[in-house]
Amino acid sequence: MARAVHRSGLVALGIATALMASCAFAAKDVVVAVGSNFTTLDPYDANDTLSQAVAKSFYQGLFGLDKEMKLKNVLAESYTVSDDGITYTVKLREGIKFQDGTDFNAVAVKANLDRASDPANHLKRYNLYKNIAKTEAIDPTTVKITLKQPFSAFINILVHPATAMISPTALEKYGKEIGFHPVGTGPYELDTWNQTDFVKVKKFAGYWQPGLPKLDSITWRPVADNNTRAAMLQTGEAQFAFPIPYEQATLLEKNKNIELMASPSIMQRYISMNVTQKPFDNPKVREALNYAINRPALVKVAFAGYATPATGVVPPSIAIAYAQSYKPWPYDPVKARELLKEAGYPNGFSTTLWSSHNHSTAQKVLQFTQQQLAQVGIKAQVTAMDAGQRAAEVEGKGQKESGVRMFYTGWSASTGEADWALSPLFASQNWPPTLFNTAFYSNKQVDDFLAQALKTNDPAEKTRLYKAAQDIIWQESPWIPLVVEKLVSAHSKNLTGFWIMPDTGFSFEDADLQ
C-alpha cells in the first residue's frame, strides 16, 4: 500500500516536473502586427521604412542610432575623417561571422559598398552611395572609403538602415535574388516569408553578442486594418502592434495586460502636388490648397490628438539647428476660393489623390482631405495604395509616365540629419524613380544650397544654407505639409526591450518575453 502511494507520488511528481520544465523551456515566440506589407528584404533596394525595419532582424550596419537618435558603434569600433573631408577610415570589430559562416571583415564591407555605389545595379538606395569613389580593404579590420567630393553627412549615410552588411558569399550566390535570401550578422535569420501574409525569423545561434537574442522567433504580420491590429493585442494573437489606432489608445490603456507607448517622432505627413502638371504648376493653386485644409481638425479626426500641425518641411526634432519653423497655414476656405479664382479655376477642378498606405488612419486622412477640398470646389478621386502598388505606380515611374497628381505620404530621415530630410524630397535629381521627390519639384537655388551645405562642416554656414533652401521651398509650396506624428504602439506587458524608433523603425535586439 505504501509502495502504491509512493509510485503514484512519483508519477505526480514526474508530471509536475515535466510541466515545470515545459513552462521553463516554452518557446519565446512573438508576433508583431504592423500596418502594411513588405516590398523586399534587401535594404539597399527598399524605399519604405517598414521593409528596412524588418530587415534589421537579419542585418546590421557599421553604425546605428540609439533612442535619442545619437550615433552608436555596431559592427564598427571607430572611424576617422581626413582633414579634406574626402577619406573615411573605419575600424571593424573582430570575430564576427555572417549567418552562413562567412567572416565579417573589410572585404565584406567593400563588397557591400561596391555593390551599393554601382549605378549598374539599379538599387533604389543608390543615391545614398553615389558619392563613393572607391572602397578599399586595408587589412581585415580596416576599411578606407574615398569620396568623390567632401560630403559632411557621410557618416550618417553609414548609419542609415539601408547600409546593412550582407554576406558577400550570399551576394555572389543569390545575386539579384538576395532580397528573398537575407544573410547578415543580425540576431535572427529567415525562417519563412509568405509574401502575402508574414515574415517569420528565428534565433541565430551564432550571434556575436553573448546572451542575445532572448526570443526564439519573431513573426512580422502585416495587418492593414487598425482595429484588427488592436484586437490581436487584446486576444493575445500579437504581443506588439504598431501603429495603434489613435481612437483606441484610451481603451488599450485601461487593459491591465497591455502597455501603451506614445513617443516623439521624425515622421512628417504631407501631400505632395505634381508641380509639372496642371493645375499644380500654378503657385496660386498650391497656395489655395494649403489654405483649404484645417490641420488642427485633421489632428483630432484622423490622429485623435496624437500629432501636431506641421510648421515646416523638416520635423523640428531633426538636426534642430537646421529645421526651420514658419507661421502655420491658417484654415481659410474663403481665401482658398479667391486664389483658385485668380488662378483661373473659379469652379474648382477635378484631380486624383493617392495615398502611399491603405491602413485605417491613411483612409481617414484621405476622406477628411477629400471633404475639405470639396468645400472649395475641388473634386478629388482618392486611392489608398498597398506597398506593391506604391512601388509600381509611384516609386517606379518617372515624370513623363507618372500618374501622380496629389500624393499623401510621409517621410522620416533615418540618417538623423537635415540633408536626408530635404534632398530626397526636393532636389531636382531626386524625382522618381531615383528617389522620392513626388512633387517633381525643381529649383536651381535650392539644389545649390543643399549641395553647398554638404561641403562645409561649419554649423553656422550649414544653418544659413539649409534655412535659405527651406525658405524657398516653403514659399513655393510644392507640398501641403500636414502633421508630425506621435508614434503610438502597444505591447503585452510580458514583452520587454521592444520599442519604436523616432523614424518609425523598430529596436528589438534586447527583446524578451517574461
Swiss-Prot record:
<dbReference type="GO" id="GO:0043190">
    <property type="term" value="C:ATP-binding cassette (ABC) transporter complex"/>
</dbReference>
<keyword id="KW-0813">Transport</keyword>
<dbReference type="GO" id="GO:1904680">
    <property type="term" value="F:peptide transmembrane transporter activity"/>
</dbReference>
<dbReference type="InterPro" id="IPR030678">
    <property type="entry name" value="Peptide/Ni-bd"/>
</dbReference>
<dbReference type="GO" id="GO:0042938">
    <property type="term" value="P:dipeptide transport"/>
</dbReference>
<dbReference type="GO" id="GO:0030288">
    <property type="term" value="C:outer membrane-bounded periplasmic space"/>
</dbReference>
<protein>
    <recommendedName>
        <fullName>Glutathione-binding protein GsiB</fullName>
    </recommendedName>
</protein>
<keyword id="KW-0574">Periplasm</keyword>
<keyword id="KW-0732">Signal</keyword>
<comment type="subunit">
    <text>The complex is composed of two ATP-binding proteins (GsiA), two transmembrane proteins (GsiC and GsiD) and a solute-binding protein (GsiB).</text>
</comment>
<feature type="signal peptide">
    <location>
        <begin position="1"/>
        <end position="26"/>
    </location>
</feature>
<comment type="similarity">
    <text>Belongs to the bacterial solute-binding protein 5 family.</text>
</comment>
<comment type="function">
    <text>Part of the ABC transporter complex GsiABCD involved in glutathione import. Binds glutathione.</text>
</comment>
<dbReference type="InterPro" id="IPR023765">
    <property type="entry name" value="SBP_5_CS"/>
</dbReference>
<dbReference type="InterPro" id="IPR000914">
    <property type="entry name" value="SBP_5_dom"/>
</dbReference>
<dbReference type="Pfam" id="PF00496">
    <property type="entry name" value="SBP_bac_5"/>
</dbReference>
<dbReference type="InterPro" id="IPR039424">
    <property type="entry name" value="SBP_5"/>
</dbReference>
